[in-house]
Amino acid sequence: MSSFSRNLLRTAGKAKSLPAYSRNAVPSSSRFVQLTAEASRPQQELPASKSEKFKVDLNRDAFKGYNFDVPKLEWETSKDELVDLYSEMVKMRRMEMAADQLYKQKLIRGFCHLAIGQEAVAVGMEAGMKPSDKLITAYRCHPFTVQKGGTIKSVIAELFGREAGISKGKGGSMHMFTPTFFGGNGIVGAQVPVGAGIAFAQQYMNTNDATFAMYGDGASNQGQVFEAYNMAKLWTLPCVFVCENNKYGMGTSAERSSMNTQYYTRGDVIPGLQVNAMDVLAVAAATKHASNFTLGGNGPLLMELVTYRYGGHSLSDPGTTYRTRDEIQTMRSSSDPIQGLKARMLHWGVVEEAELKRIDKAAKEEVDQAVEEAKQSPQPKEETLWTDIYYPGTEPDWMRGRDRTEIHRYR
């Protein structure tokens, strides 16, 4: 044994023991703040027409601001929109549940991160964004892909690695894209400066569109996130930085990894907005307000969406070694975004229970059909390995393959 190793062991023997962390080390009260699914009530008697707009009051705890005027505690909606929001959240959950089962059947391989419990984030953001606004996120991206123009079939087929996949079977779970959705990115936090770059391009081309650059609480301490904040503020970019705070970065609670878990306050001179993201109407209202703010020439905004994932970090994580089953069940029973919207619609008389059951059944049938169609799609042909790497017309003359003797010539 070297002298260095002996000294290290002697030092370790004299050191004070570190505090032990248990699953209950973080008070549940600090975890669950702002996570109630209660939201709102109509400001007026509901119109008879399903398409006619009316306003609902949002819960007084829907928003918190940091050097920022929070949105009004109201959302203008219609019976049709409420039903659509419910239907979309149910379909997103059904899609993710199907992916869970297909993974366990070994029909999906590799990385797979699901968003069960977080449906109000993707659905609510899409309801509040302009169609031309851009969005980029990390690897928990399946619902965003569908909401930004993909299909359930294209997502499932991509998970299978088939030609009908949104990335033609070459991207997998973490790499899905549409014309307004820039992924689906596998490197923790790396998408945030890319999002700032997208916002710069929009500003440069004067498109009057906003970019929503998303990341999780687990990525919030990455240096590149703060570098992106700095450049976006310096250049007054139309960028909304969105921390999707589901309370755990892999198996580490937010309180154990961040000295300040009020993520919406971490932008220094960038204003912040915290949102109850278990309420789809609050998410929609906040997203619309954020887009209008940054497109008004005010520069970036830091928005924190407080949510909760029911499953593990990925399908290789059972999700119960670092939190109790009671904690998960409490969230399911008290703050579920789908059940919360369902209860309000029934209470307001927007829809009958039978209609919601029909929607639930239709969502299951749509996902089941998408799965079967995805299974029929063929595997990508080997020669497609060389395609979709460069923008058409910008390819080099040739590219080296798996070894120096394998050469593919584009021209």
Regions flagged by a language model, labelled:
Residues M97-Q101, Q105-W235, S253-N260, Y264, ...:
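Cofactor-binding active-site loop characterized by glycine-rich and histidine/acidic residues
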Residues Y139, L305-T307, I389:
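A general secondary-structure junction signal
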Residues F181-Q379:
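Glycine-rich ThDP/TPP pyrophosphate-binding loop and its adjacent helix/strand module
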Residues M89, K106, G128, L159, ...:
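Alpha-helix boundary/capping residues
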Residues S40-P47, F54-D57, W75-D84, C112-I116, ...:
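Short, mixed-charge, low-aromatic patches
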Residues R94, R140, A277:
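Residues that form or immediately flank small-molecule/cofactor binding pockets and catalytic motifs
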Residues S2-V121, G311, P318-T321, R325-R411:
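Conserved acidic/glycine
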